[in-house]
């Protein structure tokens, strides 16, 4: 092979001033291609025939072959190499090949560029690869094996500990006695407890205990053996090997046994540690329950029949995937909540985190840090993680009492090692081997195997409120004396490096004096007496003798000893970046889209903190969505109050301790629904707090609380009366609404559909496809509301709007969801925050629009002025609304309605007229701002999403086998332009919505009540989807008296009420003789939808257009349906059902397009049609 050095008689030195040569030299220097020039070699005429020696040419010949375009290519190559990113649209590789092909085969520089190209191509891939296909690499093994696919036993449970630092300093053969060291340097004086300087709570140290025992469990038989894996795989919960793992699994549906954890050792720690593990157990069970419901890509298809192998695979796939997700949340808590608190980042408004999983790009100037290489923990870090000085006073007492009882009444501070460990052995063996039979802190298991929430929450609340101890000398509780003595003996038996050797190993400066270790003269003098030289101080207990770090904001929050502070960060990076399941295999495909999202951090919430998800999934019925206890449990609440006040965020959180939310009772019969929803005195609406949150002014005033749906007081009724006066519908206006919506629907079909296929003779039949929910139904509703309220919507005509179609719908949907669909406590904090921002932004634009019109129509005053001068200026002319639709169109040859001009004049000006009427109706002496947030914005929020849901469910019914028989007749009616045909279509719409719609409305019970209820319908045993009930032939016999206590909640299931044969005869059939005002999906009673007379026209108009499409059908496969699941409430543990035995409710949950989250409404469904 040719040498890479320059040689031969043709070689000459290039002058530094020679620009082309200088360029190649610089390029070579960057690319690492050039070596030192070699002297010319002699010409030997008798060289072997295959000698690698051949003549090479220099830059002179290269320049003769290249042009300016080639120089540009080299510059581009250099830039790409430095950045590590190649924009292939610039065809760099192809241009480089063109350049190289021009150079002579003997070109020295050409060879070097070629070598650089080969190096770059080689480094594009991992060598060797770190991830692999195959079932054995798909999930975490119970014992941690196969994490490194090339060294499968690296870090496996039962391995020997590794050694980090080389011990070279001569060890004193007669070191000080561990008992003396503990009594003088480590023991805590009970009267001199030092609270943690940063007011860190005990919960952080409980979490640290889980981490420590996740990766360190020393064998009592052979202290060089680690009984657990070297990975953060939650082995205290899941077990250290397959046998232990099986003991905690339910072996059904991927579940863990309720409220269990595998490790017996955990029962020897304060009960808060066990509660945290139970919370992870509950999170796991929530996740696997959700995975089974969603069944992403049919990967968790439930077997049918008695195929044992299939059922075992189903259970295992769910369990293992759930474990990956739960460990994903665990590691995110470690990296964000835990490490941010350690670094005091929780005290500043910054979302920066130390995340070892960062995706490093490959470039000329740097190479990515290796990842997924595995890990094996070392003895040094086993000693680093002994943080007994952080034990709180309460936990000191608990541990002392527990050990005293285990020792038969003897003080643990005076117990000998044999006595101590004999007692611990007896204590551990006193717990049953079956995790489900164990108790915790005196709590007893319920019938379903779980613990009562209140007992667990009490332990956790007290732990959050209990400040931990400070690091530093003389602060380890006396009850830990035997444990610490054992630790020192183990460190000596392991022959670990000294404190200075370890510090040097991790890159820290060696201590030169004892005062460098700790400036406290007492501590320094004791160290000098024990060791004689700083270089001789043992790692353990040396790290306990170090002075703790000061509080630095941000930078130092845990305030550990200096060596510990640096070491734990290195270890965190190593544990995470070396773990295949946290790096190269931590993907949505492996965790599912839902699982990946469920474990993910969101920097817009708590600057990335994620532990609130654990709290809300474990205890969904106790913590408020903004509870400081759930969002920041690693610092005591009183200190969190100071932190949040300094950041201006104190009002964002609730400072109340957790308490159980009111119990909810389901009401099903139509008669009971009518009774409750018409009784405003004893049953109150519950949306006032949410509406008020969205509309509250910074100054404290809150006009939204007076809105119609915010309460049942006279002021709320007055708001409804005002709103009803503003929503007028003369016959001519109804026609214009219909025309507007039909034209808008045709325009949306034209704008957002795609031609996907040509077929038939001469390919003249064209097939079109569109997402009918996302791009038609949702946007038609958004455009209508934008027109009615003069909202600033952009159009294709270039109108000066603010929101696109989809942006407007998302904003309206967000606001609606925060008021009416806020039932997932783990998502509520972000939902409410985003909805308030959307409300304030849109409200400010509406207010600005009204103020601008005030300069034209003097009936409008400045936003802070009273509205008192009532004129008809706007009604007599009106400015153009922000959102104008298109109507008067015609159908072109492609079956899509074309633009035909402006919207009908009356609807076009109706938006401004509506605003004027609402402001005037709001009352004398009120400002425009009050009217906007007290009446206009809440009324805007109350509509769009509900109509989208109703229409989507109706269309789905008629496109299913259940309702398809009606399509031909509906299509015929849709082709007719008569009022009768339109009204008949409306009846079809209402019937389809009644059969498929899912609506339930809550009420707060204001006084003790009794209600007669019954069960109108039952699940069809032949229907696995639970979509189709059957009428209950013994409905009357199921009548029962429901006792409702003051302060409890009722959920009136209007879905079941819509299938009640006493109100809707033949409830499962489409009948066109029902009264349109009898339907329940707009609500019942005084809070029934105020605008139902209007929206029934808008919905029918959209429905009519869709029915006119030729060959209307679903798109192929799953794209043509929306995934619908029976709705169920998560109550903290699998199988736990609150209240009565569940019946058919008809309520459904949906999933979004990528199946990463649940939704209250269908979001996507693609349809096709031909022309």
Curated annotation (Swiss-Prot):
GO biological process, one term: response to oxidative stress
Biased amino acid composition, Low complexity: 1-22, 881-895
Region entry Epoxy alcohol synthase, spans: 675-1171
Region called Fatty acid alpha-dioxygenase, residue ranges: 114-457
Binding site for heme b: 213, 388
Span list, region Disordered: 1-56, 873-900
Alphabetically ordered keywords of this record: Calcium, Dioxygenase, Heme, Iron, Isomerase, Metal-binding, Oxidoreductase
SUPFAM superfamilies assigned to the protein according to its UniProt record, in alphabetical order: Cytochrome P450, Heme-dependent peroxidases
Cofactor: heme b; Ca(2+); heme
Pfam families noted in UniProt: An_peroxidase
GO molecular function term, any single one: iron ion binding
Quaternary structure (record): Homotetramer.
Alphabetical list of PANTHER family matching this protein: PROSTAGLANDIN G/H SYNTHASE, PSI-PRODUCING OXYGENASE A
Name of the featured protein: 7,8-linoleate diol synthase
């Amino acid at each position: 092979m040719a040498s890479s050095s320059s040689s031969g008689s043709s070689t000459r030195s290039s002058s530094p001033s020679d620009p082309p040569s200088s360029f190649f030299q610089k390029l070579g220097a960057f690319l690492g291609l050039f070596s030192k020039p070699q002297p010319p070699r002699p010409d030997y005429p008798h060289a072997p025939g295959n000698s690698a020696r051949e003549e090479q040419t220099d830059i002179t010949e290269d320049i003769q072959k290249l042009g300016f375009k080639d120089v540009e290519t080299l510059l581009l190559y250099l830039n790409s190499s430095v950045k590590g990113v190649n924009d292939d649209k610039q065809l760099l590789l192809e241009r480089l090949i063109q350049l190289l092909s021009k150079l002579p085969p003997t070109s020295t520089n050409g060879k070097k560029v070629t070598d650089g190209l080969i190096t770059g191509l080689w480094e594009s891939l991992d060598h060797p690869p770190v991830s692999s296909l195959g079932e054995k690499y798909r999930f975490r093994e119970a014992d941690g094996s196969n994490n490194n696919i090339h060294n499968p036993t690296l870090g496996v449970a039962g391995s020997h500990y590794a050694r980090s630092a080389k011990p070279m300093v001569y060890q004193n053969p007669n070191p000080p006695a561990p008992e003396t060291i503990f009594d003088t340097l480590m023991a805590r004086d009970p009267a001199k407890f030092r609270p943690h300087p940063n007011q860190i709570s005990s919960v952080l140290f409980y979490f640290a205990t889980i981490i420590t025992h996740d990766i360190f469990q020393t064998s009592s038989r052979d202290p060089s053996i680690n009984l657990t894996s070297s990975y953060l795989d939650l082995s205290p919960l899941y077990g250290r090997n397959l046998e232990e793992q099986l003991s905690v699994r339910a072996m059904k549906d991927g579940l863990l046994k309720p409220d269990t954890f595998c490790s017996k050792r955990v029962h020897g720690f304060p009960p808060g540690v066990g509660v945290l593990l139970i919370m992870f157990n509950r999170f796991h069970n929530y996740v696997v329950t959700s995975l089974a419901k969603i069944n992403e890509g049919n990967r968790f298809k439930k077997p049918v029949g008695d195929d044992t192998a299939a059922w075992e695979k189903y259970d295992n796939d769910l369990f293992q995937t759930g474990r990956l997700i739960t460990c994903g949340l665990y590691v995110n808590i470690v990296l964000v909540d835990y490490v941010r608190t350690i670094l005091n980042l929780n005290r500043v408004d910054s979302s920066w985190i130390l995340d070892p999983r960062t995706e490093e790009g490959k470039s000329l100037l740097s190479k990515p840090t290796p990842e997924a290489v595995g890990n094996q923990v070392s003895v040094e870090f086993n000693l680093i993680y002994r943080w007994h000085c952080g034990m709180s006073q309460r936990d000191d007492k608990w541990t002392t009492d527990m050990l005293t009882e285990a020792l038969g009444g003897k003080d643990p501070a005076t117990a000998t090692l044999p006595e101590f460990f004999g007692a611990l052995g007896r204590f551990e063996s006193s717990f049953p081997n079956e995790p489900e039979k164990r108790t915790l802190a005196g709590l007893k298991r319920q019938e379903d195997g779980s613990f009562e929430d209140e007992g667990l929450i009490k332990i956790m609340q007290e732990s959050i409120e209990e400040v931990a101890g400070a690091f530093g000398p003389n602060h380890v509780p006396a009850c830990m004396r035997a444990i610490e003595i054992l630790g020192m003996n183990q460190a000596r038996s392991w022959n670990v490096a000294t404190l200075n050797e370890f510090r040097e190993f991790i890159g820290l400066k060696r201590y030169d004096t004892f005062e460098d270790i700790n400036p406290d003269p007492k501590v320094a003098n004791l160290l000098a007496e024990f060791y004689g030289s700083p270089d001789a101080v043992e790692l353990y207990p040396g790290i306990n003798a170090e002075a703790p770090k000061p509080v630095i904001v941000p930078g130092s929050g845990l305030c550990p000893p200096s060596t510990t502070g640096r070491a734990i960060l290195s270890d965190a990076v190593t544990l995470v970046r070396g773990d295949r399941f946290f790096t190269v295999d931590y993907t949505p495909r492996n965790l599912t889209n839902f699982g990946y999202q469920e474990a993910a951090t969101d920097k817009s919430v708590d600057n990335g903190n994620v532990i609130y998800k654990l709290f809300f999934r474990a205890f969904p019925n106790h913590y408020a969505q903004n509870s400081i206890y759930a969002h920041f449990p690693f610092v005591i609440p009183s200190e969190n109050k100071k932190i949040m006040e300094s950041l201006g965020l104190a009002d964002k959180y609730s400072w109340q301790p957790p308490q159980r939310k009111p119990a909810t009772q389901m009401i099903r019969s139509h008669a009971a629904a009518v009774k409750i929803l018409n009784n405003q005195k004893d049953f109150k609406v519950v949306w006032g707090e949410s509406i008020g949150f969205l509309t509250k002014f910074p100054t404290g005033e809150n006009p939204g609380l007076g809105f119609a749906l915010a309460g049942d007081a006279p002021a709320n009724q007055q708001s409804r009366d005002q709103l009803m006066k503003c929503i007028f519908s003369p016959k001519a206006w109804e026609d214009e609404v219909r025309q507007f919506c039909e034209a808008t629907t045709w325009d949306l079909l034209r704008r957002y559909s795609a031609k996907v296929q040509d077929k038939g003779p001469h390919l003249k039949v064209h097939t079109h496809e569109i997402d009918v929910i996302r791009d038609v139904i949702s946007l038609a509703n958004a455009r209508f509301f934008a027109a009615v309220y003069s909202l600033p919507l952009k159009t294709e005509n270039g109108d000066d709007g603010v929101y696109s179609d989809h942006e407007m719908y998302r904003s309206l949907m967000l606001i609606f969801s925060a008021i009416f669909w806020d039932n997932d406590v783990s998502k509520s904090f972000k939902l409410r925050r985003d909805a308030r921002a959307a409300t304030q932004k849109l409200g400010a634009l509406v207010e600005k629009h009204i103020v601008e019109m005030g300069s034209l129509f003097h009936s409008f005053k400045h936003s802070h002025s009273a509205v008192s001068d009532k004129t008809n200026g706007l009604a007599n002319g009106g400015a153009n609304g922000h959102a104008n639709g298109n109507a008067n169109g015609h159908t072109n040859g492609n079956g899509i309605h074309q633009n035909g001009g402006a919207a009908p004049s009356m609807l076009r000006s109706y938006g401004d007229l509506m605003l004027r009427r609402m402001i005037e109706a709001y009352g004398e002496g009120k400002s425009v701002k009050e009217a906007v947030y007290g009446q206009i914005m809440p009324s805007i929020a109350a509509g769009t999403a509900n109509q989208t849901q109703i229409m989507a469910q109706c269309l789905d019914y008629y496109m299913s086998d259940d309702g398809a028989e009606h399509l031909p007749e509906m299509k015929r009616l849709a082709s007719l332009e008569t009022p009768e045909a339109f009204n008949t279509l409306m009846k079809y719409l209402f019937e389809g919505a009644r059969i498929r719609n899912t609506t339930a409305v809550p009420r707060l019970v204001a006084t003790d009540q009794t209600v007669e209820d019954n069960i109108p319908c039952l699940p069809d045993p032949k229907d696995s989807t639970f979509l189709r009930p059957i009428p209950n032939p013994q409905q009357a016999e199921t009548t029962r008296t429901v006792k409702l206590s003051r302060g409890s909640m009722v959920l009136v299931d209007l879905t079941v009420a819509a299938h009640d044969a006493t109100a809707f005869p033949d409830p499962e059939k489409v009948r066109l003789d029902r009264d349109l005002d009898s339907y329940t999906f707009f609500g019942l009673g005084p809070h029934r939808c105020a605008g139902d007379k209007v929206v029934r026209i808008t919905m029918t108009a959209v429905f009519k257009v869709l029915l006119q499409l030729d060959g209307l059908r679903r798109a192929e496969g799953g794209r043509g349906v929306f995934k619908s699941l029976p709705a169920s409430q998560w109550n903290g543990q699998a199988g736990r059902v609150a209240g009565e035995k569940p019946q058919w409710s008809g309520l459904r949950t949906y999933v979004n397009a990528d199946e990463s989250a649940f939704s209250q409404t269908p979001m996507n469904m693609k349809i096709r049609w031909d022309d």
